[in-house]
Amino acid sequence: MSHNHEQEHDLITLVDEQGNETLFEVLLTIDGKEEFGKNYVLLVPAGAEEDADGQIEIQAYSFTENEDGTEGALQPIPEDADAEWIMIEEVFNSFLDED
């Protein structure tokens, strides 16, 4: 399992069910192909600042690369995917410790 983070964040636009677009920064990507057959991405709203408690909203998604090597569509991670959430939390905590 590996993760990738850089000082300059990539941006991604997510579109909700109503067609509203929201810009996000890619905080962290996680290679989970070996263990779970897919990759993961952690996103934060672009320009978001911490709230009064020092918290910031982070969203996690999985994705599987398309056959042509391009990244596929983002998929929500099921709430009951305990092993995946544990792995994501462990990698995220390591990421925080590095910063």
Curated annotation (Swiss-Prot):
Q: Which InterPro entries match?
A: UPF0473 (IPR009711)
Tell me where the transmembrane regions lie. none
Give the UniProt family note: Belongs to the UPF0473 family.
Q: What is this protein called?
A: UPF0473 protein SMU_2077c
This chain's source organism reads: Streptococcus mutans serotype c (strain ATCC 700610 / UA159)
Q: What is the lineage of its organism?
A: Bacteria, Bacillati, Bacillota, Bacilli, Lactobacillales
